[in-house]
Amino acid sequence: MDRVKLTGVVLRAVDYGESDRVVTLLTAERGKVSAFARGARASRRRFGGALEPFTLLSAEVRERSGSDLLGLDSVSVVRGFGALRGDLGRIACAGYAAELARELVRDHQPHDELFELLVAYLDALDAGPPRPAALRAFELGALRAAGLMPRLDACARCGAPVGEGPVRFDAGEGGALCAGCAPGVPRTLPLAAGTLAALLRLQDGGLAAAASEPLAPPAGREAREALTAFLEHHLGRRLAARRFLDEIGPLLGA
């Protein structure tokens, strides 16, 4: 079988049998793929520590007859993101970003935008402590890449301008609701004027905008609750990594 080279981030690594490992990668070339690393646990000589989550690597893979899994023949580390691995908060945020990326895309569908966003977010975590604004920017960017962006600049139900806020937010309706539509929707979430403005800046400016966006409480809490609800609505559940962030999140604002 012909071998091809892929550049990807390890989203998940699962032990298989006594000595093997199955890794899920988000790649620049093929989107999300899974690969079988034979003997990865028996000897570190072949793969070293390259198959750990959040590693950016270059991989040589091949198709395997009768299997959806690629065969992983060799890897080299492009970026190990070693600094983020020494801090629980950064690990938790990286784990959440990786799980979110894994759940939002289907196999073998190229997602250049999401791949580049994930690498940029891991770079930010490697460079310094987690910032709530950066995580919100990652969530918004990931939703954009998946075609699921919430409506924030106008009412998600009727399309009327919502102005500068405050507004109500509903995941099922698709985003912000104007004063006329909100009363007819139960259990909406509040978005103060400052929260709405911050989310719009992050939606437009991405991770670059997050560097100058404090997103301090209570805006940080409102933004987190709104995007968490929106993601849960589309994914059908709360991600395991999000639940872990909920446990340690008060220390991070994440």
From Swiss-Prot:
Q: Where is it found, in Gene Ontology cellular component terms?
A: bacterial nucleoid
Q: Which InterPro entries match?
A: ARFGAP/RecO, DNA_rep/recomb_RecO_N, NA-bd_OB-fold, RecO, RecO_C
Q: Which UniProt keywords apply?
A: DNA damage, DNA recombination, DNA repair
Gene3D superfamilies reported in the protein's UniProt record? Nucleic acid-binding proteins, Recombination protein O, C-terminal domain
SUPFAM superfamilies in alphabetical order:
ArfGap/RecO-like zinc finger, Nucleic acid-binding proteins
- Example of a GO biological process term: double-strand break repair
Task: Supply the name of the protein.
Answer: DNA repair protein RecO
Please name the source species. Answer: Anaeromyxobacter sp. (strain K)
Q: Please spell out the taxonomic lineage of the organism that makes this protein.
A: Bacteria, Pseudomonadati, Myxococcota, Myxococcia, Myxococcales
Q: Which gene encodes it?
A: recO
